[in-house]
């Protein structure tokens, strides 16, 4: 399992490594090429999770470490079977 995590989520460091291959990246640097084979994303509002980012990817779950969710295209995720939460 591959998980990409926004590097501004310091409390997660070390928590998922026993279970997954984890990559910590600045939110603005999370690109379609990087998420292509990722199973999950843990993001903040800087990462726009829409068709441009997710099309053709293996992502099945997006967790947002934010109060709002306006950076997640819920309609697109629903059509693709991508679960998300914030």
Where are the predicted features?
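N-terminal glycine-/charge-rich "phosphate-binding" loop or analogous flexible N-terminal tail
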Residues: 1-38
């Amino acid at each position: 399992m591959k998980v990409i995590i926004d590097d501004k989520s310091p409390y997660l460091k070390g928590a998922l490594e026993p279970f997954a291959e984890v990559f910590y990246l600045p939110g603005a640097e999370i690109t379609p090429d990087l998420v292509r084979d990722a199973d999950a994303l843990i993001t903040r509002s800087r990462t726009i999770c829409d068709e441009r980012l997710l099309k053709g990817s293996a992502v099945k779950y997006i967790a947002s470490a934010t109060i709002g969710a306006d950076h997640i295209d819920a309609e697109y995720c629903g059509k693709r079977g991508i679960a998300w939460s914030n």
